[in-house]
Amino acid sequence: PQCASALDEPAKRAISIKRTLDTVNEISHAFLLPALLRGRVGEFSISALESELEGIQEKIDAIAFELYEISEDDQNAIKLGNKEESSLDSSIEADEEADADDLEEESGDNTSDQGNLLSWCVGVGFGRFDLRLATLERSAPPEPDPFDPLPAKSPGMLPDGAAPFHVHEGILVDDQGHPHDLARLVEEVLARVDVAVPEDVRRWLQRDFFPFHLQRYSKSRRKA
């Protein structure tokens, strides 16, 4: 019982870290803001979080070995198996990254922090994401408990009933000077969050955005 209770806090912290890492992933139920803006709603360092998570995993393993009275030989065998599995996962991940690199060659640096920021700006323009988190006009909601039901919307999305950044009929256009010109809206969003506006926003939208969006929102990034 003492060992079992000792697992409570590290397990909860591990879940919290994994969720925090997902707060910059716009297709996650935990999404808040893109990486370039995430620090505005709380301290955020991917390397520090991943390092802490690795330490927690080692602590949980040690407690589990003691709890189930795993011999030292079996512990070594388990650790070896975990390393082999990790190596296989890394190989699969490398293949997926190679596929993503192919897409990047076709559509620019789509997985960069800037690409993610511009994608978020597009979402703000369409009324999907909430600009107010980045301007601190709205506070981030508290972290849910591990077994709470998944929300219908991520906390970074515009709440029901809230006014969107730009009122439109569901269609935005690529037409300089048009009141619903998407490139202009993206530039306005960047200005509102005090981020320098790139010179090539319209070009990025014309050439890079759709391949990026398809890659991000497809179930698999692999190409036949």
Where do the model's predicted regions map?
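Active-site-proximal loop/hinge segments that shape catalytic or ion-binding/gating pockets
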Residues: 68
